A protein has these predicted regions:
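LysM (lysin motif) carbohydrate-binding repeats in extracellular/periplasmic proteins that recognize
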Residues: 116-119, 160
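Substrate-binding/gating loop at the entrance of the active-site cleft, primarily
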Residues: 98, 129-131
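Regulatory, non-catalytic segments
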Residues: 120-129
Length: 168
């Protein structure tokens, strides 16, 4: 049986976010973009055959908006990692354990998943993270504490970390 895919686009104080998923869970979510179209374009061609259903994503939307209001949110969302590798899933789940307002290094994530020395592979897995914010890759920093590697750009990474620190 074919899975009915759904999507919605909504506005946040940081920009427009698109959610994409099914009853199996949230499969993709964009970082905030300047326009709804830019946000939808990041999902890819899959969105063309999906059903627009804002109500389906109401829980996700409410949690994301609370996050941008500075609430300490541990996202409680059913996720669908699709065809991700076991390593990617382990990295993403380890990233989800980093608390609001905290950071961890790539090598720290590698140690958490019992793969010391795999910091670069952790970076690759995070670069392919389809669920930023939910899988908070913005909380991953360099071993020296510097901001590095973030698909949303350094300005967005810094803004998200600043939002979380200001809410501590």
């Amino acid at each position: 049986m074919t899975q009915v895919m759904k999507y919605t686009v909504f506005s946040t104080p940081f920009g427009w976010i698109t959610c994409f998923g099914s009853v199996k869970g949230l499969k993709k979510m964009t970082l905030p973009q300047l326009s709804p179209q830019q946000s939808m374009d990041l999902i890819g061609e899959e969105i063309d055959s999906a059903e627009h259903d804002p109500d389906f994503f109401n829980d996700v939307i409410q949690q994301v908006l609370a996050y941008f209001d500075g609430e300490e949110i541990a996202f409680n969302v059913k996720l669908d990692y699709g065809d991700a590798t076991p390593f990617q899933k382990a990295v993403w789940e380890a990233a989800r354990t980093i608390s609001f307002g905290q950071t961890e290094s790539y090598s720290g994530i590698a140690r958490r998943i019992n793969k010391p020395g795999a910091a670069r592979a952790v970076g690759t897995a995070l670069r392919n993270n389809p669920l930023p914010l939910i899988v908070p890759c913005h909380r991953i920093i360099g071993a020296d504490g510097g901001l590095c590697g973030f698909g949303g750009g350094f300005a967005m990474k810094e803004a998200l970390l600043t939002l979380e620190k200001a809410s501590d």
